[in-house]
Every structure is written in structure tokens, then in C-alpha cells.
Amino acid sequence: AEVFLNDLSKVYRYLLRNNEDGMSTVRTEVQFIQSYFDLLKTRHGDALFLQMDIDKRYDDYLLPTLSLQMLVENAVKHNALSRNYPLHIEVFTTVGNKLVVNNNIQKRAQKAPSGEVGLKNIRMKYELLNQPGFQVMNDGKNFTAVLPLIWEKTMRNRPLHYSENKN
């Protein structure tokens, strides 16, 4: 219970401090998603797995705040999770300054209502930043989102500001 409350407080603190910020560092988002995932793991147990492979050279690159959380939440919302058929979520960096979030598709018996609000929100943030390259792909077996990572020096005089970890 103590570990759960600690993770819950980290998630809540991050949401309160960073929800208004437009951009966060990869380091900050990855730290947050680990705490968020720990909460999901408490609920879903062995029905959910997260694998992260983030190259440290991207730690100070930027991406829209809460993008990873929206994509992980999207994966959990739209897929069936069970111990026999676990949901696997991968988060990794790749050449060309990109962060990829990929999950296997396991359709729910009852489709969750969706207006694709999270995906539209991420797309809109990249458009506001005039940053091309956000992609979403669904091949029927995997759902993949590609997030362009932005070098801080290119963000000067942009409409959204960014946050470093404020914990």
C-alpha cells in the first residue's frame, strides 16, 4: 500500500505541476510514465508489461507534456488485458530523433467509446509547434505512434514553453 501511495502521489504531483506546460524533457516524461505505469501494474498485474529502451542522449530533448501518458492510457483503454494474453507496451528511441510507443492489439469484446481525443491533442500540440512527423500506424497486430523529439535550442520563440523536472 505504501508503494502504491508513493506512486500515486508522484503521478498526482506531476499532473498538478506540469499539466499547463506545453513541453517536457524526455527524462521527465519517462520518469513520470514509470510511476504512472506502476499504478497501472498494481491494478492489472501480469496482464500488462512495459519495456522502455530510451537512449540517454535524448534525455534533454523535448516532447509535448503528457504525450506518453496519453498513449499508454490509450493502449490500456482500447485493448483487452489478461494474464493469458497480456498487453505489451514498448517505448523506445530511434534514429532521426524519434520516440516510438508500440503496443500489441487485442480488441476488447466491447469497444471502448473513443473520439481519439488523446491522439488529436498530441497532433494539435505538434502542429502548434510547427513540428512535422507525428505518426500513428495500425496494422491490425500493432498500434504504433511516432513522436518527433525536439532539441531545446530550436524551441526559442515558440508558443509553448517547456518544463524540467520540478520534483
What are the functions of these language-model segments?
Residues 152-167:
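C-terminal end segment of the histidine kinase catalytic
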